[in-house]
Amino acid sequence: MKRKIGLITAMVLGTIFLQAQQNTTHTGSTGFGLRAGVNFQNINGKDENGNKLENDMLTGFNIGINVEIPVAPDFYFQPGLLYTMKGAKSTDVILGQTFNSTIKISYVELPLNLLYKPLLGKGHLLLGFGPYVAMGVSGNVTITGSNTSQSRDIKFQNTVKITDPNNVVYMKPMDAGANMIAGYEFRNKVSFQLNTQLGMLNINPEYASMPNDKTSAKNTGFGFSLGYRF
Protein backbone atom coordinates (compact mmCIF):
# COMPACT_ATOMS: atom_id res chain seq x y z
CA MET A 1 0.00 0.00 0.00
CA LYS A 2 2.76 2.51 0.96
CA ARG A 3 4.70 1.68 -2.23
CA LYS A 4 1.54 2.25 -4.30
CA ILE A 5 0.88 5.60 -2.59
CA GLY A 6 4.49 6.65 -3.17
CA LEU A 7 4.25 5.78 -6.87
CA ILE A 8 0.99 7.70 -7.28
CA THR A 9 2.50 10.70 -5.49
CA ALA A 10 5.57 10.67 -7.73
CA MET A 11 3.42 10.47 -10.88
CA VAL A 12 1.23 13.36 -9.75
CA LEU A 13 4.21 15.55 -8.87
CA GLY A 14 5.88 14.73 -12.19
CA THR A 15 2.77 15.60 -14.19
CA ILE A 16 2.27 18.87 -12.31
CA PHE A 17 5.93 19.83 -12.77
CA LEU A 18 5.94 19.13 -16.52
CA GLN A 19 2.69 21.02 -17.08
CA ALA A 20 3.97 23.96 -15.05
CA GLN A 21 7.22 24.04 -17.02
CA GLN A 22 5.29 24.14 -20.30
CA ASN A 23 3.07 26.99 -19.15
CA THR A 24 6.01 28.92 -17.71
CA THR A 25 7.66 28.77 -21.11
CA HIS A 26 4.59 30.14 -22.87
CA THR A 27 3.09 32.56 -20.35
CA GLY A 28 5.61 33.13 -17.59
CA SER A 29 2.81 33.25 -15.02
CA THR A 30 2.65 29.73 -13.57
CA GLY A 31 3.52 29.65 -9.88
CA PHE A 32 4.24 27.07 -7.21
CA GLY A 33 2.94 27.48 -3.68
CA LEU A 34 3.31 26.10 -0.18
CA ARG A 35 0.33 25.94 2.18
CA ALA A 36 -0.32 24.86 5.77
CA GLY A 37 -3.24 25.29 8.11
CA VAL A 38 -5.73 23.93 10.58
CA ASN A 39 -8.75 21.70 9.89
CA PHE A 40 -12.02 21.37 11.80
CA GLN A 41 -13.30 17.99 10.67
CA ASN A 42 -16.28 15.77 11.37
CA ILE A 43 -17.72 12.47 10.19
CA ASN A 44 -21.40 12.66 9.29
CA GLY A 45 -23.79 9.86 8.44
CA LYS A 46 -25.72 7.05 10.11
CA ASP A 47 -24.90 4.20 12.49
CA GLU A 48 -25.55 0.50 11.87
CA ASN A 49 -29.22 0.95 12.81
CA GLY A 50 -29.77 3.91 10.50
CA ASN A 51 -29.69 6.55 13.27
CA LYS A 52 -27.95 9.87 12.63
CA LEU A 53 -24.37 10.05 13.91
CA GLU A 54 -23.89 12.58 16.71
CA ASN A 55 -20.20 13.44 16.47
CA ASP A 56 -18.17 16.49 17.45
CA MET A 57 -15.52 18.24 15.39
CA LEU A 58 -11.88 17.20 15.55
CA THR A 59 -9.08 19.74 15.17
CA GLY A 60 -6.45 18.58 12.68
CA PHE A 61 -3.99 20.08 10.23
CA ASN A 62 -2.98 20.10 6.58
CA ILE A 63 0.26 20.85 4.79
CA GLY A 64 1.22 20.63 1.16
CA ILE A 65 2.02 22.19 -2.20
CA ASN A 66 0.06 23.40 -5.21
CA VAL A 67 0.63 24.96 -8.59
CA GLU A 68 -1.38 27.57 -10.49
CA ILE A 69 -1.62 26.93 -14.23
CA PRO A 70 -3.25 29.76 -16.26
CA VAL A 71 -6.17 28.71 -18.46
CA ALA A 72 -7.79 32.11 -19.20
CA PRO A 73 -7.49 35.71 -17.97
CA ASP A 74 -7.84 35.61 -14.16
CA PHE A 75 -8.61 31.86 -14.21
CA TYR A 76 -6.22 29.10 -13.15
CA PHE A 77 -6.21 25.34 -12.83
CA GLN A 78 -4.85 24.63 -9.35
CA PRO A 79 -3.89 21.02 -8.60
CA GLY A 80 -2.30 20.31 -5.25
CA LEU A 81 -0.92 17.57 -3.05
CA LEU A 82 -1.68 17.65 0.68
CA TYR A 83 -1.07 15.63 3.80
CA THR A 84 -4.18 16.17 5.90
CA MET A 85 -5.77 14.86 9.09
CA LYS A 86 -9.50 14.16 9.27
CA GLY A 87 -11.77 12.45 11.77
CA ALA A 88 -14.21 13.17 14.58
CA LYS A 89 -14.86 12.95 18.32
CA SER A 90 -17.86 11.54 20.17
CA THR A 91 -19.17 11.00 23.69
CA ASP A 92 -21.37 8.03 24.60
CA VAL A 93 -22.96 6.88 27.83
CA ILE A 94 -23.10 3.08 28.19
CA LEU A 95 -24.48 1.43 31.35
CA GLY A 96 -24.06 4.68 33.22
CA GLN A 97 -20.41 5.18 32.19
CA THR A 98 -19.19 7.95 29.90
CA PHE A 99 -16.81 7.04 27.08
CA ASN A 100 -14.96 9.54 24.87
CA SER A 101 -13.88 8.39 21.41
CA THR A 102 -11.51 10.07 18.96
CA ILE A 103 -11.02 8.98 15.35
CA LYS A 104 -7.96 10.35 13.53
CA ILE A 105 -7.38 9.50 9.86
CA SER A 106 -4.42 10.80 7.85
CA TYR A 107 -4.78 11.13 4.08
CA VAL A 108 -2.66 12.06 1.09
CA GLU A 109 -5.08 14.28 -0.81
CA LEU A 110 -5.20 15.61 -4.37
CA PRO A 111 -7.46 18.68 -4.81
CA LEU A 112 -8.17 19.80 -8.38
CA ASN A 113 -9.56 23.32 -8.25
CA LEU A 114 -10.59 25.93 -10.79
CA LEU A 115 -9.37 29.21 -9.31
CA TYR A 116 -10.68 32.71 -10.08
CA LYS A 117 -7.97 35.23 -9.15
CA PRO A 118 -8.78 38.82 -10.17
CA LEU A 119 -6.97 41.91 -8.96
CA LEU A 120 -8.45 43.39 -5.79
CA GLY A 121 -6.69 46.33 -4.19
CA LYS A 122 -2.95 45.65 -4.13
CA GLY A 123 -3.41 41.89 -4.21
CA HIS A 124 -5.70 39.23 -5.63
CA LEU A 125 -9.03 37.78 -4.58
CA LEU A 126 -9.06 33.97 -4.42
CA LEU A 127 -12.25 32.05 -5.23
CA GLY A 128 -12.21 28.41 -6.25
CA PHE A 129 -13.97 25.09 -6.30
CA GLY A 130 -13.38 21.57 -7.53
CA PRO A 131 -13.21 17.89 -6.65
CA TYR A 132 -10.70 16.09 -4.48
CA VAL A 133 -9.57 12.50 -4.12
CA ALA A 134 -7.66 11.14 -1.15
CA MET A 135 -5.94 7.94 -0.03
CA GLY A 136 -5.82 6.93 3.63
CA VAL A 137 -2.29 6.30 4.90
CA SER A 138 -2.65 5.89 8.68
CA GLY A 139 -5.02 6.40 11.57
CA ASN A 140 -6.14 5.32 15.00
CA VAL A 141 -9.14 5.27 17.29
CA THR A 142 -8.81 5.99 21.01
CA ILE A 143 -11.49 5.30 23.61
CA THR A 144 -11.24 6.56 27.17
CA GLY A 145 -13.55 6.08 30.14
CA SER A 146 -13.41 6.46 33.89
CA ASN A 147 -11.69 3.08 34.30
CA THR A 148 -10.43 2.23 30.84
CA SER A 149 -8.33 3.53 27.97
CA GLN A 150 -7.50 1.79 24.73
CA SER A 151 -6.21 2.62 21.27
CA ARG A 152 -6.59 0.72 18.02
CA ASP A 153 -4.95 1.29 14.66
CA ILE A 154 -7.02 1.83 11.54
CA LYS A 155 -6.61 -0.67 8.71
CA PHE A 156 -7.77 0.32 5.24
CA GLN A 157 -9.81 -2.14 3.19
CA ASN A 158 -13.12 -2.08 1.35
CA THR A 159 -14.58 -5.35 2.66
CA VAL A 160 -14.11 -6.97 6.06
CA LYS A 161 -14.32 -10.76 6.14
CA ILE A 162 -15.38 -12.81 9.15
CA THR A 163 -11.83 -14.18 9.43
CA ASP A 164 -10.17 -10.73 9.52
CA PRO A 165 -8.55 -9.66 12.83
CA ASN A 166 -10.82 -7.82 15.26
CA ASN A 167 -8.08 -5.89 17.06
CA VAL A 168 -8.12 -3.02 14.52
CA VAL A 169 -10.70 -0.56 13.19
CA TYR A 170 -11.49 -0.83 9.49
CA MET A 171 -12.02 2.05 7.07
CA LYS A 172 -12.19 2.24 3.29
CA PRO A 173 -8.93 3.59 1.83
CA MET A 174 -10.44 6.08 -0.63
CA ASP A 175 -12.18 9.37 0.05
CA ALA A 176 -13.50 11.82 -2.52
CA GLY A 177 -15.75 14.84 -2.63
CA ALA A 178 -15.94 18.55 -3.37
CA ASN A 179 -14.21 21.56 -1.88
CA MET A 180 -14.50 25.34 -2.11
CA ILE A 181 -11.95 28.00 -1.26
CA ALA A 182 -12.08 31.74 -0.63
CA GLY A 183 -9.24 34.00 0.36
CA TYR A 184 -6.86 36.80 -0.49
CA GLU A 185 -3.29 36.90 -1.78
CA PHE A 186 -1.28 39.95 -0.75
CA ARG A 187 1.25 41.73 -2.95
CA ASN A 188 4.11 39.97 -1.13
CA LYS A 189 2.68 36.57 -2.27
CA VAL A 190 1.48 35.61 1.21
CA SER A 191 -2.14 34.42 1.21
CA PHE A 192 -4.88 33.64 3.69
CA GLN A 193 -7.53 31.11 2.75
CA LEU A 194 -10.77 29.59 4.05
CA ASN A 195 -11.71 26.19 2.68
CA THR A 196 -14.76 23.97 3.08
CA GLN A 197 -15.03 20.32 2.16
CA LEU A 198 -17.86 17.86 1.65
CA GLY A 199 -17.03 14.17 1.37
CA MET A 200 -19.23 12.14 -0.98
CA LEU A 201 -17.89 8.61 -0.44
CA ASN A 202 -18.88 6.31 2.40
CA ILE A 203 -15.62 5.48 4.19
CA ASN A 204 -17.21 2.71 6.25
CA PRO A 205 -16.35 -0.73 4.78
CA GLU A 206 -18.75 -3.57 4.10
CA TYR A 207 -18.81 -6.27 6.80
CA ALA A 208 -19.50 -9.86 5.72
CA SER A 209 -20.85 -10.58 9.21
CA MET A 210 -23.30 -7.63 9.04
CA PRO A 211 -25.28 -7.89 5.77
CA ASN A 212 -27.91 -5.44 7.04
CA ASP A 213 -25.43 -2.83 8.27
CA LYS A 214 -26.76 0.67 7.54
CA THR A 215 -23.64 2.54 8.61
CA SER A 216 -22.71 5.53 6.45
CA ALA A 217 -19.71 7.73 7.27
CA LYS A 218 -18.57 10.73 5.22
CA ASN A 219 -15.84 13.26 5.93
CA THR A 220 -16.83 16.91 6.12
CA GLY A 221 -15.29 20.07 7.52
CA PHE A 222 -13.66 23.44 7.00
CA GLY A 223 -10.35 25.07 7.75
CA PHE A 224 -8.02 28.04 7.54
CA SER A 225 -4.56 28.14 6.01
CA LEU A 226 -1.65 30.39 5.15
CA GLY A 227 0.31 30.10 1.95
CA TYR A 228 3.25 31.52 0.06
CA ARG A 229 3.64 31.56 -3.71
CA PHE A 230 7.00 31.52 -5.47
Sequence positions of predicted segments:
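Outer-membrane beta-barrel channels and translocator barrels
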Residues: 27, 72, 119-122, 187-189
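Repeated loop/turn-to-beta-strand initiation elements of outer-membrane beta-barrel proteins
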Residues: 75-77, 123-125, 188-194
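Glycine- and aromatic-enriched membrane insertion/assembly motifs of diderm outer-membrane
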Residues: 52-98, 189
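Transmembrane beta-strands of outer-membrane beta-barrel pores
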Residues: 38-42, 83-87, 109, 118, ...
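Predominantly the C-terminal beta-signal and adjacent terminal strand-loop region
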Residues: 166-169, 175-180, 185-230
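Short glycine/proline- and aromatic-enriched beta-strand/turn motifs that initiate or cap beta-hairpins
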Residues: 21-64, 122, 145-147, 161, ...
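Flexible, solvent-exposed loop segments that connect beta-strands
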Residues: 43-55, 85-105, 137-171, 203-217
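Residues that define the transmembrane beta-barrel architecture of outer-membrane proteins
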Residues: 28-30, 57-61, 104-110, 174-178, ...
